[in-house]
Amino acid sequence: MLIHIPSVLTVEEVAHCRQIMAGAEWVDGRVTAGPQSAMVKNNLQIPLSSDAHREMRDIVLRALGRNPTYNSAALPLRVVPPLFNRYDAGMSFAAHVDNAIRPIHETGARVRTDLSSTLFLSEPDEYDGGELVLHEPGSTQELKLPAGDMVLYPTTALHSVNEVTRGSRLASFFWTQSMIADEARRRIMFELDRTIMDLRTRLPDDDLAVLNLTNCYHNLMRQWCVL
């Protein structure tokens, strides 16, 4: 289930992150890659220990906390603190698999990567190439979203970033451990939540149909969530 979530960051938040990135230190992006991914990864990242990273990390985490679509679709239990990268002309990231388990840099805790997110920080017309490509059996899907928009997709998907041929592509990326590991069950919960929200626009909250469907949602959460 791939979900495009518009305006995760406000225009002002994007501009502030861009300003921070303009003055930040950048290092080889392979520092956070596994052995296989490191062989095909060619980009730059902001160091995890830097003040720039910490400030932007907090901006993104606050934005995720207030975004109902992300919280409904991901049902997040833990989030690997967002990372920030840059692809200049000639840089790319060939098809690769993300690690199933990732550490949290500051605490050493480990997170199971159920969902991957890319939060775009450059406008599509600022660079050529640089599309995020999801490789599914028999098909591929390319994404290049407006600054502030995010794509959420299962970490099980093979994916790549096309070579940038002009300009620079700025983005944040991170992983989420969901309270529900199974993708099919997460989809059911997301669709059920959206149905309840739609029903509430047409019926009062104390309507029996709304109450019964909401009760079903929470009973499924009790059955399927692992905390």
Swiss-Prot record:
SMART domains: P4Hc. Signal peptide: none annotated. The keyword Acetylation does not apply. Residues 78-178 form the Fe2OG dioxygenase domain. GO terms for molecular function: 2-oxoglutarate-dependent dioxygenase activity; iron ion binding; L-ascorbic acid binding. Its EC number is 1.14.11.-. Gene3D superfamilies: q2cbj1_9rhob like domain, Rabenosyn, Rab binding domain. This is PKHD-type hydroxylase GDI1238/Gdia_1949.
